[in-house]
Design a protein with these regions (language model features):
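Membrane-proximal interfacial segments on either side of biological membranes
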Residues: 1-160
Length: 160
């Protein structure tokens, strides 16, 4: 799956690269998903640029943590001059069972669980800070809904 084609049609933010995945044990009840196991990983079958935009990083942060705290990092120091970052690998597993949604990183290095791993010289790692966390599917749906709402502009508050 070409991420650039997919992300050009949804408001998550621009990503380039190829992914592959599987969806297993998918069931619907009362018009909404009730169970699934989704795995998404980088596809290295062709050499294509792998990059993620700042907007996509912010939106994936909302999905994975429920907050935009990564915005502070992206708007500080040298980071504010970049609109996208290279990455080396994507590894994500989402499961839903008994109304509990779980998001896990499949890349494990140095005791950390990564959803997205930075490239060798530059980039931003997306670390799953709370790997054992599960939330209700309703809460995850609300997080997804927040992606399509206008963001409030942060205001610089003078220190005094």
């Amino acid at each position: 799956i070409d991420l650039e084609e997919v992300t050009s049609n949804i408001k998550i933010g621009r990503m380039t690269g190829l992914i592959q995945g599987s969806l297993k044990n998918f069931t619907m009840e009362y018009g909404q998903p009730s169970r699934f196991d989704l795995v998404i990983t980088s596809d290295r079958s062709r050499k294509v640029p792998q990059a993620i935009s700042v907007d996509a990083i912010k939106n994936l942060s909302i999905i994975s943590t429920g907050s935009e705290t990564i915005s502070d990092i992206l708007n500080s120091g040298l980071n504010r001059f970049f609109s996208q970052y290279p990455y080396s690998e994507i590894g994500i597993r989402c499961t839903l069972s008994d109304d509990l949604f779980s998001l896990r990183g499949l890349i494990r290095e140095g005791g950390k669980e990564y959803l997205i791993r930075r490239s060798t010289f530059r980039g931003i790692d997306m670390v799953n800070q709370n790997p054992d966390n599960s939330i209700s599917f309703k809460d995850m749906s609300e997080r997804m809904g927040r992606l399509f709402q206008p963001r409030q502009q942060s205001k610089d508050v003078p220190s005094g």
